[in-house]
Amino acid sequence: MKNIELSNLYLDISQEILGKSLINNSEELIFIVCVEKSLSYLADDIYDNSTIDLNPIEHLNCLYKWKELSNSIALRNIITKELSSEGLFSILEKSKSIFFREDNKNLITTSEINDLKKFNLIIDRYKAFKELLRKTLDEC
């Protein structure tokens, strides 16, 4: 399979998970992993199909692939926005850290949770990001 097909497949799987009325912990983790894999394959596809002169990215994890792609002048503004503290990658990393955190029962805190609203936000941000990248690359 081509990288773009794998990216779309993982995105479809994550959307199917959101289509369920109730999501359990294992499905939350699968959702996060699928979105991350989809982003990783999308980065590979962009790298493979463009004339961008960058260091190889196949050995990097998802986040660092995008950081390397952000060195491209044509893509810098789009990717940097999503790498910021309010961007897609930060939201995804927060969701992952929430999933793996251990709550300290001795502390009184209000802790952030993963919920359907957050996962829908991730999918919406990802689709908008992907569409903007596609339009930019088609114009270049």
Predicted regions and their residues:
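Surface-exposed polar/charged interaction patches
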Residues: 17-20, 69, 136-139
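N-terminal interaction modules that seed assembly of large macromolecular complexes
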Residues: 19-56
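Long, charged low-complexity segments
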Residues: 54-57, 63-121
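Glycine-rich, aromatic-bearing surface loops/beta-hairpins
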Residues: 121-140
